[in-house]
């Protein structure tokens, strides 16, 4: 039994009752399950949330990467959040990506880069402003979003993971409750099955995984990391509490400015799903 998967699934479904099914924004148009990678049409789909243009020529774009511990989760569980983002004037693109154990990490990262290429290929017809693109993600999605920001200008790493290149470059983003520190997560006994499905290695042998370095996006944060990033976290996050510290330390070391948000109150994992 994968306790971590059960916990992530329960968290999505529990919050869904109180948020996604209650809060709606009627002015937002939604296009669901658009295939962005023809080689994996059952996996690589995205939803698009667009507000009225209201006289503008193009939409600023936000890519939202869902969480779920790399082994579960779906864009479906972020539909309320994405409607709220779209109501702020953004065109929100919410992709699904390959989950473990079917896809071993970091295949999911290459899927996201295929999504970014799709955005570039369809920017003109969908009136997307490629000079004004942000990324956000929570939990595993926060880790993936952070890695994307760290390697978007790193051709060597992108080639290593088989990621297709595109001219899309994110100007910044919002990282929420990101799982940046695999060493910290490996101390939790319930992470063993998660890591086995994700990498083929249990928590005690995780460092033997050939792509272990890619699990920690902080390893790739350099001077090219965008300065317009907010890092949000909860005080009592049972899953990834304290993971934000290694990212803060690296950004401070490089002198890269960032915005920090610590959730008020309990500040549980993915607290933001309650607050839109």
Task: Please name every model-derived segment.
Residues 1-276:
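Alpha/beta-hydrolase superfamily serine-hydrolase fold, recognizing
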């Amino acid at each position: 039994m994968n306790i971590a998967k059960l916990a992530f699934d329960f968290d999505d479904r529990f919050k869904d009752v109180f948020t996604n099914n209650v809060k709606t924004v009627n002015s937002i148009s939604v296009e669901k399950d658009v295939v962005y990678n023809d080689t994996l049409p059952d996996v690589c789909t995205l939803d698009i949330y667009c507000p009225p243009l209201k006289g503008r020529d193009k939409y600023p774009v936000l890519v939202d990467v869902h969480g779920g511990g790399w082994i579960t989760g779906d864009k479906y569980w972020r539909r309320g959040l994405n409607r709220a983002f779209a109501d702020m004037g953004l065109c929100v693109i919410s992709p699904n990506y390959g989950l473990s154990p079917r896809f071993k990490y970091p295949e999911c990262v290459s899927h996201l880069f295929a999504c970014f290429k799709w955005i570039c290929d369809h920017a003109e017809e969908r009136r997307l402003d490629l000079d004004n693109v942000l990324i956000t993600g929570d939990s595993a999605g926060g880790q993936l979003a952070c890695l994307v920001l760290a390697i978007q200008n790193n051709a060597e790493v992108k080639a290593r993971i088989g990621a297709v290149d595109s001219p899309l470059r994110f100007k910044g983003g919002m990282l929420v409750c990101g799982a940046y520190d695999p060493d910290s997560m490996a101390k939790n006994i319930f992470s063993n099955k998660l890591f086995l499905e994700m990498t083929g290695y249990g928590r005690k042998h995780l460092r033997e995984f050939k792509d272990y370095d890619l699990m920690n996006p902080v390893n790739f944060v350099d001077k090219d990391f965008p300065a317009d990033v907010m890092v949000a976290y909860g005080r009592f996050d049972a899953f990834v509490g304290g993971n934000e510290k290694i990212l803060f330390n690296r950004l401070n070391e490089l002198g890269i400015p960032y915005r920090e948000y610590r959730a008020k109150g309990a500040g549980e994992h993915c607290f933001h799903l309650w607050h839109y």
